[in-house]
A protein has these predicted regions:
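Acidic/glycine-rich phosphate/pyrophosphate-binding loops and surrounding catalytic core
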Residues: 1-147
Length: 147
């Protein structure tokens, strides 16, 4: 496992992901959601998992609107159960809707890697075998997938 992720490790990727997802703007949200609307959302685990990607998810929301506030229920490396709240965000509704897909994608991908790795480690426990990382990572994601 690497040391804690630093913003320089992930902010360029978060910005690129948002630019790719939003493109020239979130036309649906702008058309349907009043600009003065505020909301709260909860990210919930669909399966048991090892949490990963919290900082990236929060960065996605903050990049869209700095007024978004959050509460972390499960931190990176902690176990989350089926139906358990992982994090909560509140702020301008437009910002939450614009960033939510990017935030979810980061958590789903990184928690998936962490959860599968934990299963491998559990399977070889007591055998003397050791699970090692690889250089074969998704381009641009090396620091994240090895974290």
């Amino acid at each position: 496992m690497l040391e804690a992720l630093k913003p320089d490790d992930y902010l360029p990727l978060v910005k690129a992901a948002l630019a790719e997802d939003i493109g020239s703007g979130d036309a649906t949200t702008l058309a349907l959601v009043p600009g003065d609307s505020f909301a709260m959302a909860v990210m919930v685990a669909r399966d048991p998992l090892v949490m990963a990607g919290v900082d990236l998810a929060l960065a996605a929301f903050q990049e869209v609107d700095e007024r978004v506030e959050f509460g972390i229920e499960i931190f990176d490396g902690q176990l989350g159960g089926l139906g358990q709240a992982l994090l909560r965000v509140q702020g301008p509704t437009r910002a939450l809707l614009t960033a939510e897909r990017t935030a979810l994608n980061f958590v789903q991908r990184l928690a998936g890697v962490a959860t599968l790795t934990a299963r491998f480690v559990e399977q070889v426990a007591g055998t003397g075998a050791e699970i090692l990382d690889t250089r074969k990572t998704t381009p641009g994601w090396r620091a994240l997938e090895k974290y």
